[in-house]
């Protein structure tokens, strides 16, 4: 279900404040956040945001094609190690 257009996108206040401060100072620092639910807005483009995946913070460089997506979409939480190589032995 989509979010109402009246409400606007969700962006954590602390994250928005950090990005605005960096834009004013014209700095490019890595911003560490746990807010995977925050929507990527146009003022984030060009910044590197380290998003927590449950174990570590993964640095993500935000491009213009990412606008409208959530930060958590770019930091996978599960690692697929593949299926069993030889399944015939386990069946017998």
Swiss-Prot record:
* Protein name as it appears in the record: Small ribosomal subunit protein uS19c
Gene3D superfamilies, alphabetically? Answer: 30s Ribosomal Protein S19, Chain A
The record's subcellular location field reads: Plastid, Chloroplast
Kindly state which keywords UniProt assigns to this record, in alphabetical order: Chloroplast, Plastid, Ribonucleoprotein, Ribosomal protein, RNA-binding, rRNA-binding
Q: Tell me, which GO biological process terms does this entry list?
A: ribosomal small subunit assembly; translation
* Organism ancestry: Eukaryota, Viridiplantae, Streptophyta, Embryophyta, Tracheophyta
One of the record's GO molecular function terms: structural constituent of ribosome
Q: What is this protein's function?
A: Protein S19 forms a complex with S13 that binds strongly to the 16S ribosomal RNA.
Q: Which organism is it from?
A: Huperzia lucidula (Shining clubmoss)
Q: Does the keyword Plastid apply?
A: yes
Which family does the record claim for this protein?
Belongs to the universal ribosomal protein uS19 family.
**Which N-terminal stretch is annotated as signal sequence?**
none
């Amino acid at each position: 279900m989509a979010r109402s257009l009246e409400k606007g996108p969700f962006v954590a206040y602390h994250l928005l404040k950090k990005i605005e401060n960096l834009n004013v100072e014209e700095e490019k620092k890595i911003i560490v956040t746990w807010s995977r639910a925050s929507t990527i807005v146009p003022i984030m483009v060009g910044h590197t945001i380290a998003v927590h995946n449950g174990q570590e913070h993964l640095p993500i460089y935000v491009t213009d094609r990412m606008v409208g997506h959530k930060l958590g979409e770019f930091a996978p939480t599960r690692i697929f190690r593949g299926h069993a190589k030889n399944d015939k032995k386990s069946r017998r």
